UniProtKB/Swiss-Prot annotation:
Belongs to the glycosyltransferase 31 family. Pfam families: Galactosyl_T (PF01762). GO terms for biological process: keratan sulfate proteoglycan biosynthetic process; O-glycan processing; poly-N-acetyllactosamine biosynthetic process; protein O-linked glycosylation. Mainly expressed in brain tissues such as whole brain, hippocampus, amygdala, cerebellum and caudate nucleus. Also expressed in colon, esophagus and kidney. Residues 50-378 are lumenal. Beta-1,3-N-acetylglucosaminyltransferase involved in the synthesis of poly-N-acetyllactosamine. Has activity for type 2 oligosaccharides. The keyword Ribosomal protein does not apply. The chain crosses the membrane at residues 29-49. Its EC number is 2.4.1.149. It comes from Homo sapiens. This is N-acetyllactosaminide beta-1,3-N-acetylglucosaminyltransferase 4.
Length: 378
């Protein structure tokens, strides 16, 4: 995701104010959070200590536990002509251009597909080593049964391949235990997030075609699912929609020392098209299908959220801005850990697992008293 540009859309916005609960109740919650954090740190050990065998009726019971899928590296040959012409660029950019035409990678781990009643698919970008982040999401806002108001939600984590750590056996077991890991056979890298976007769109169209909406975000976002569902109540999934923290008039970064550097040879225009910050946004079923189709013919771009904005422009669509998406975090003078502020938002970016657990405990506390205040509007 690109650094925020100095614009009115990214200045601090108003929100609710409130007080943190104090006394024995707060102390009890903090003790629970500490205990839970320690438990999650032992997740890997617990997974290995649990019985590997599934019940006899489980269709995967015959699969050996200690046989994780082996990456089948792409046989796509490098484009040496492009590589020779880009010798003046940083190595990461040369590598991207050399293999930009390679866009078909195998699935290594795959969850079950969506049911016909799936209302919201939560597609979260993660990495193999982010075990604690995935555990935090599953135990907080990803506990979809407690948030869904009778509507069916599905959680999926999106991964590439990141060497041998953590052990592939652990990731394979995590996949079988939670049925929410979607991993492809390409290397985890910032420039490969566009590959992750393309392969996600393909998978959704194939495995979750009936999902009404999809929320795509990073594994360090806090999503207030009830607020997202309330917002979506007025939208038809058959109509185009992509809503989030929209960035307009962003300039390509020409500084070769930052990872967002884009040389003029890769993008000559003065500004990027409008795009939603990649920390998190929501799109309708109709937009998912149209994006997937246009992406198949689009030239890949190193920055994934800008790439989506480029595809939207080709479709003649504009992303919708909503102040409830805080993809650059909560700015001062607002309190970034005010639970009353979170109660009025849809998504907040850049929370650690401990902050996520803390905010979950506070936001879901029925005894929390908040002063009246406006809920962010579109």
């Amino acid at each position: 995701m690109l650094p925020p540009q100095p614009s009115a859309a990214h200045q601090g916005r108003g929100g609710r104010s409130g007080l943190l609960p104090k006394g024995p109740a707060m102390l009890c919650r903090l003790c629970w959070l500490v205990s839970y954090s320690l438990a999650v740190l032992l997740l890997g050990c617990l997974l290995f200590l649990r019985k590997a065998a599934k019940p006899a009726g489980d269709p995967t019971a015959h699969q050996p536990f200690w046989a994780p899928p082996t990456p089948r590296h792409s046989r796509c040959p490098p484009n040496h002509t492009v590589s020779s012409a880009s010798l003046s660029l940083p190595s990461r950019h040369r590598l991207f251009l050399t293999y930009r035409h390679c866009r078909n990678f195998s699935i290594l781990l795959e969850p079950s597909g969506c049911s016909k009643d799936t209302f919201l698919l939560l597609a979260i970008k993660s990495q193999p080593g982010h075990v604690e982040r995935r555990a935090a999401i599953r135990s907080t806002w990803g506990r979809v049964g407690g948030w869904a108001r009778g509507r069916q939600l599905k959680l999926v984590f999106l991964l590439g391949v990141a060497g041998s750590a953590p052990p592939a056996q652990l990731l394979a077991y995590e996949s079988r235990e939670f049925d929410d890991i979607l991993q492809w056979d390409f290397t985890e890298d910032f420039f490969n997030l566009t590959l992750k976007e393309l392969h996600l769109q393909r998978w959704v169209v194939a495995a979750c075609p009936q999902a009404h909406f999809m929320l795509k975000g990073d594994d360090d976002v806090f999503v207030h699912v009830p607020n997202v569902l309330e917002f979506l109540d007025g939208w038809d999934p058959a109509q185009d929609l992509l809503v989030g923290d929209v960035i307009r008039q962003a300039l390509p970064n020409r500084n070769t020392k930052v990872k967002y550097f884009i040389p003029p040879s890769m993008y000559r225009a003065t500004h990027y098209p409008p795009y939603a910050g990649g920390g998190g946004y929501v799109m309708s079923r109709a937009t998912v299908r149209r994006l997937q189709a246009i992406m198949e013919d689009a030239e890949l771009f190193p920055i994934d959220d800008v790439f989506v904005g480029m595809c939207l422009r080709r479709l003649g669509l504009s992303p919708m801005h909503h102040a409830g998406f805080k993809t650059f975090g909560i700015r001062r003078p607002l309190d970034p850990l005010d639970p009353c502020l979170y109660r009025g938002l849809l998504l907040v970016h850049r929370l650690s697992p401990l902050e996520m657990w803390t905010m979950w405990a506070l936001v879901t506390d029925e005894g929390l008293k908040c002063a009246a205040g406006p809920i962010p509007q579109r």
